[in-house]
Curated annotation (Swiss-Prot):
Positions on the Extracellular side per record topology: 30-697
Subcellular location: Cell membrane
GO CC term (a single one): plasma membrane
Protein name in UniProt: Protocadherin alpha-6
Signal peptide boundaries: 1-29
Pfam families with a match to the protein in the record: Cadherin (PF00028), Cadherin_2 (PF08266), Cadherin_tail (PF15974)
SUPFAM superfamilies per record: Cadherin-like
Gene name, Swiss-Prot/TrEMBL: PCDHA6
Record-annotated disulphide pairs: none
Length: 950
């Protein structure tokens, strides 16, 4: 055969389309795979590269890729081995619903040259859904007149699976009256009904309980059960009948309210009331059907009554009952299927899942706070959503999967600075115009116990008057914790310690919640002047944190101790002491002395003495020293004076109110010759008690000597230091009188104690005077810090300040420096810590205004017992260094102890009270001659009488 050029060209043009068609068929070949639903990640689907005829080595160079109109994340290809595998969970019911066929369509594309392959992956159904009835209990009403073989419709079960897995078989529990009627309708669904096998008798059995079981065709089989409650009614013979048993309607979701869905028509062969039909929803109808639809009872017209939403519900199954008005009424039934058509009307939806709320303030960076998922029910660009977060917050959004985000911690938190954050998540779709939605998330910062309770100051000073009532509130401590809730719940407790031999908790208690400090018992200034303790504040965190604060409680003195008499034979206020006084005693002579002590301090312990009643006549021969208690003569005694005098001495302190004690002194006037005998008898009477206290007095003497030696050494050292120190500015001048001010208050603030310099014109300034500034407060509790206050501040209370021109007498100055005074000042007020009074130093030498009296002691707080002096007609003899005084007082002892050795025949009187001068009386005795025996008997009789008066 010969081919011309024209024939060859025509044949080539015809061959080219054939080759292209063959290449397209080869390139567009289609593969089919199958995979069961719910397959695990990595499940093998098929060797797609091998099946497509592609070499493994050319997959990457040829840009092998896969696309799908469905979810692309369900399947994935391993480019290393060319295997198609399951990438994420596949739910057939979610992917295809009840469609008989379900497959995933993939497009495989490779370049160089471009080739497109179509792959269908069939998703096989597995039996993972059991049959479900719409309700757990169905009620069926059956008239007893119904004939056997009557069928009553039942609500069947539904199975979300397909194929044989969704083929249901029903089984009814055993009953002689009922059976199960199963029919297959046009869409191959089974319509079940309750078959009446035997006539019912309501009077015999008004109700029947049955169980209907649905079993699917899967392997293994799954079942569902519903309870049937059959009520037998007594009604007529014909029920209304619809034209068809099932109706189907389609309507858009944006249909207006009032739109007619369908108009039903039912007929009843009965006449009259039994043929009058009313329409209604079946009692088993879902609540959402009633919310969205309504039916006219007379016409059977169903209309829309609520907004329809395709995304919320796209299918409604409505069971309608047509009931006649017979007695009893009968009903016919039909089903209306309403399918909703979709419209694009949805905004993005945001779902927040809080995982770690609240967030601890010590959480690490990257801690996941919440999970956020977004969804848009629309499709295409309208369903693509992007999320953003409120700026300038310590959090950020991290995308994990498609439409899934994690809210994580991006920087450190501090609850004390910011306790909560209000976050706003914004989701915006890709539509035009764009629709967006926001969601708020409140992130609270959980507290961590990182702050200990703190007090406003590390130490508090509290002033409390003694004799407070038990349970008295004296102070309130308060601590602040910057944390919150339990971490800021502060409880208070007492830091236990010993106070002497007792526990601190026996004195003080602290309320655990309020921090109020209470005194559990009355405090006694004489027993405890300062109580220092700590209160602990501890929070309720884990672990708990705490801190302590120190409280210094000063117990202020009150006038709660009456003066106590120290006379040996005075048994209290009702006792009496007798004293013999010669008529020859001169004016101003001390004939007796009343001694008293007061356990209080300050003005409460400053004692004054006065006669009761006061002397009504200027010629009354006796008087008592206002502050010394010394009874002295006011004039020379004469024969006209009564031989016996009963003196009542009232001892009164300066407290408010003042407390008193009364001493009775019986003074008998005797002739000078009788005094030695009386004194001798008194000395013999006192010998017994003195002998009993010899051992005690020896130890007291040793103690007094030791204290005196220590005092002398201290004074010498102090003098040496003062002499070596340079002079300071503001030294006192010699021409200015010393002014010592005292304040008229009833109690003294010991926290305001300060040492004052007392100056005189005769020597260097004195630094041993303790002055106390008063703290005036109407309340029994005074609180505050010890701060400097002016000692010259005026006060209106009594007693008034002393006259600055007042001076001590020469005899008083001698008595102040005597050993008797030092002994009394040290012993009468000595406590566990030693003497608690400072000795006042006053340097002035002016004539005393009145013998036997002394003005108030200088410096508040000096016990009045320190102002005890011996008086005589002149200055008493001063003891030299290392010597002891003739007599000194031992508190509580029955007599004045004599230290100096006396001759055996000495007649010195050793009575309990200091009386007049004995030396003068002794001289008079030596000058007198012995009387006759009658005179001696007379004197003896007088002496006996005097002793009886005592």
């Amino acid at each position: 055969m010969v081919f011309t050029p024209e024939d060859r060209l025509g044949k080539q043009c015809l061959l080219l389309p054939l080759l292209l068609l063959a290449a397209w068929k080869v390139g567009s070949g289609q593969l089919h795979y199958s995979v069961p639903e719910e397959a695990k990640h990595g499940t093998f689907v098929g060797r797609i590269a091998q099946d497509l005829g592609l070499e493994l080595a050319e997959l990457v160079p040829r840009l092998f890729r896969m696309a799908s109109k469905d979810r692309e994340d369900l399947l994935e290809v391993n480019l290393q081995n060319g295997i198609l595998f399951v990438n994420s969970r596949i739910d057939r019911e979610e992917l295809c619903g009840r469609s008989a066929e379900c497959s995933i369509h993939l497009e495989v594309i490779v370049d160089r040259p471009l080739q497109v392959f179509h792959v269908d992956v069939e998703v096989r159904d597995i039996n993972d859904n059991p049959p479900l009835f719409p309700v757990e209990e169905q009620r069926v009403l059956i008239y007893e007149s119904r004939l056997p073989d009557s069928v009553f419709p039942l609500e069947g079960a539904s199975d979300a699976d397909v194929g044989s897995n969704s083929i249901l078989t029903y089984k009814l529990s055993s009953s002689e009256y009922f059976g199960l009627d199963v029919k297959i309708n046009s869409d191959d669904n089974k319509q079940i009904g309750l078959l009446l096998k035997k006539s019912l008798d309501r009077e015999e059995a008004p109700a029947h309980n049955l169980f209907l079981t649905a079993t699917d065709g899967g392997k293994p089989e799954l079942t569902g059960t519903v309870q049937l409650l059959v009520t037998v009614l007594d009604v007529n013979d014909n029920a209304p009948n619809f034209e068809q048993s099932e109706y189907e309607v389609r309507i858009f979701e944006n249909a207006d309210n009032g739109t007619t869905v369908i108009k039903l028509n039912a007929s009843d062969r009965d006449e009259g009331a039994n043929g009058a039909i009313s329409y209604s929803f079946n009692s088993l109808v879902a609540a959402m059907v009633i919310d969205h639809f309504s039916i006219d009872r007379n016409t059977g017209e169903i209309v829309i009554r609520g907004n329809l939403d395709f995304e919320q519900e796209n299918f409604y199954k409505i069971r309608i009952d047509a009931t006649d008005k017979g007695h009893p009424p009968m009903a016919g039934h039909c089903t209306v299927l309403v399918r909703i058509l979709d419209k694009n009307d949805n905004v993005p939806e945001i779902a927040l899942t809080s995982l770690s709320l609240p967030v601890r303030e010590d959480a690490q960076f990257g801690t996941v706070i919440a999970l956020i998922s977004v969804n848009d029910l629309d499709s295409g660009a309208n369903g693509q959503v992007n999320c953003s977060l409120t700026p300038h917050v310590p959090f950020k959004l991290v995308s994990t999967f498609k439409n899934y985000y994690s809210l994580v911690l991006d920087s450190a938190l501090d609850r004390e600075s910011v306790s909560a954050y209000e976050l706003v998540v914004t989701a915006r779709d890709g539509g035009s115009p764009s629709l967006w939605a926001t969601a708020s998330l409140s992130v609270e910062v959980a507290d961590v116990n990182d702050n200990a309770p703190a007090f406003a100051q590390p130490e508090y000073t509290v002033f409390v008057k003694e004799n407070n009532p038990p349970g008295c509130h004296i102070f309130t401590v308060s601590a602040r914790d910057a944390d919150a809730q339990e971490n800021a719940l502060v409880s208070y407790s007492l830091v236990e310690r010993r106070v002497g031999e007792r526990a601190l908790s026996s004195y003080i208690s602290v309320h655990a919640e309020s921090g109020k400090v209470y005194a559990l018992q009355p405090l006694d200034h004489e027993e405890l002047e300062l109580l220092q303790f700590q209160v602990s504040a501890r929070d309720a965190g884990v672990p708990p944190l705490g801190s302590n604060v120190t409280l210094q409680v000063f117990v202020l003195d009150e006038n709660d101790n009456a003066p106590a008499l120290l006379a040996p034979r005075v048994g209290g206020t009702g006792g009496a002491v007798s004293e013999l006084v010669p008529r020859s005693v001169g004016a101003g002579q001390v004939v007796a002395k009343v001694r008293a002590v007061d356990a209080d301090s300050g003005y409460n312990a400053w004692l004054s003495y006065e006669l009761q009643p006061p002397a009504s006549s200027a010629r009354f021969p006796f008087r008592v020293g206002l502050y010394t208690g010394e009874i002295s003569t006011t004039r020379v005694l004469d024969e006209a004076d009564s031989p016996r005098h009963r003196l009542l001495v009232l001892v009164k302190d300066h407290g408010e109110p003042a407390l008193t004690a009364t001493a009775t002194v019986l003074v008998s006037l005797v002739e000078s010759g009788q005094a030695p005998k009386a004194s001798s008898r008194a000395s013999v009477g006192a010998a017994g008690p003195e002998a009993a206290l010899v051992d005690v007095n020896v130890y007291l003497i040793i103690a007094i000597c030791a204290v005196s030696s220590l005092l002398v050494l201290t004074l010498l050292l102090y003098t040496a230091l003062r002499c070596s120190a340079p002079s300071t500015e503001g030294a006192c001048t010699a021409d200015k009188p010393t002014l010592v001010c005292s304040s008229a208050v009833g109690s003294w603030s010991y926290s305001q104690q300060r040492r004052q310099r007392v100056c005189s014109g005769e020597g260097p300034p004195k630094m041993d005077l303790m002055a106390f500034s008063p703290s005036l407060s109407p309340c029994p509790i005074m609180m505050g810090k010890a701060e400097n206050q002016d000692l010259n501040e005026d006060h209106d209370a009594k007693p008034r300040q002393p006259n600055p021109d007042w001076r001590y007498s020469a005899s008083l100055r001698a008595g102040m420096h005597s050993s008797v005074h030092l002994e009394e000042a040290g012993i009468l007020r000595a406590g566990p810590g030693g003497p608690d009074q400072q000795w006042p130093t006053v340097s002035s030498a002016t004539p005393e205004p009145e013998a036997g009296e002394v003005s108030p002691p200088v410096g508040a707080g000096v016990n009045s017992n320190s102002w005890t002096f011996k008086y005589g007609p002149g200055n008493p003899k001063q003891s030299g260094p290392g010597e002891l005084p003739d007599k000194f007082i031992i508190p509580g002892s029955p007599a004045i102890i004599s230290i100096r050795q006396e001759p055996a025949n000495s007649q010195i009187d050793k009575s309990d009270f200091i009386t007049f001068g004995k030396k003068e009386e002794t001289k008079k005795k030596k000058k007198k001659k012995k009387g006759n025996k009658t005179q001696e008997k007379k004197e003896k009789g007088n002496s006996t009488t005097d002793n009886s008066d005592q």
